[in-house]
């Protein structure tokens, strides 16, 4: 294995680590409009990720640095072509971080609701745009002979890209609900379990559509790694179904894992 392949796997592992570890943070943020009927409940929800949310974002910084160091041309094409989408992600993450830090310091109900809204936006928007970006990388994006992106943000918002974004939002939302169910008790715990059951069924349907479409895209492109794509899709489907199975058995730790 030469260095190009080695760094490819390193960058891949770092991005996967980011989506897994910061992903459930996004899911917890998405849950605020649906869980926690009072300030005590919402505070309980936010406290589940209080010690870890900022550390988990370190994975993204390290992944971006490794991508720049190992594949500068790829980095340049990605960050110039997806500039607006990545800028929106960055702004959303800033809003989310500010809201986490300043929400406990403001006592007014209007301030609390405003910070809660920013947390939700800062959780949904990055998940949606990351899903759109990854789906477009799988599908392929228009590049010229200089490897410069020739499309726009609207080019990325194609049906397959949007389905990828919605799929990631639902998966991370479900992951966050499992985490809330694992870390809370009383009313918040029960509400999170009920909501996770409903969201789980929707996620299975949407994720199945996305995975099937992904296989068809790989087949249409005559991808040499088509068997690997099929195996990865099957593994993702099995993992999602197993998480729902463990959730129904009230084994929240296994469902979250």
Residue ranges and their predicted role:
Residues 1-55, 61-64:
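N-terminal signal-anchor module of multipass membrane proteins
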Residues 8-9, 15, 62-74, 206-217:
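Membrane-embedded alpha-helical segments in integral membrane proteins
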Residues 102-256:
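Long, contiguous internal "core" modules enriched in hydrophobic/ aromatic residues
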Residues 22-23, 55-67, 127-133, 169:
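The first (N-terminal) embedded transmembrane alpha-helix
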Residues 7-18, 79-93, 120-121, 155-171:
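Alpha-helical transmembrane segments
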Residues 47-69, 193-207:
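Transmembrane alpha-helical insertion/packing segments
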Residues 21-22, 26-31, 90-103, 170-180:
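Membrane-water interface of transmembrane alpha-helices
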């Amino acid at each position: 294995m030469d260095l190009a392949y080695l760094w490819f796997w390193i960058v891949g592992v770092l991005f996967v680590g980011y989506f897994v570890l910061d992903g459930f943070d996004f899911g917890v943020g998405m849950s605020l409009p649906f869980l926690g009927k009072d300030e005590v409940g919402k505070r309980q929800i936010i406290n589940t990720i209080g010690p870890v949310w900022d550390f988990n974002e370190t994975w993204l910084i390290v992944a971006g640095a490794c991508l720049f160091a190992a594949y500068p041309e790829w980095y340049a094409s990605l960050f110039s072509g997806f500039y607006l989408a990545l800028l929106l992600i960055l702004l959303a993450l800033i809003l989310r971080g500010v809201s986490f830090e300043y929400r406990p310091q403001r006592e007014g109900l209007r301030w609390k609701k405003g910070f809660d809204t920013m947390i939700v936006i800062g959780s949904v928007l990055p998940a949606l745009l990351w899903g759109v970006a990854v789906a477009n990388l799988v599908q392929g994006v228009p590049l010229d002979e200089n490897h410069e992106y020739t499309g726009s943000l609207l080019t990325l918002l194609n049906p397959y890209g949007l389905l990828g974004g919605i799929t990631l939002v639902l998966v991370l939302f479900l992951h966050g609900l499992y985490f809330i169910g694992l870390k809370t008790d009383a009313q918040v715990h029960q509400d999170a379990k009920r909501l996770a059951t409903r969201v789980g069924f929707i996620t299975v349907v949407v994720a199945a559509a996305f995975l099937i479409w992904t296989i068809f895209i790989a087949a249409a492109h005559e991808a040499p790694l088509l068997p690997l794509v099929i195996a990865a899709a099957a593994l993702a489907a099995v993992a999602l179904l197993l998480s729902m199975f463990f959730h129904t058995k009230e084994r929240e730790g296994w469902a979250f894992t």
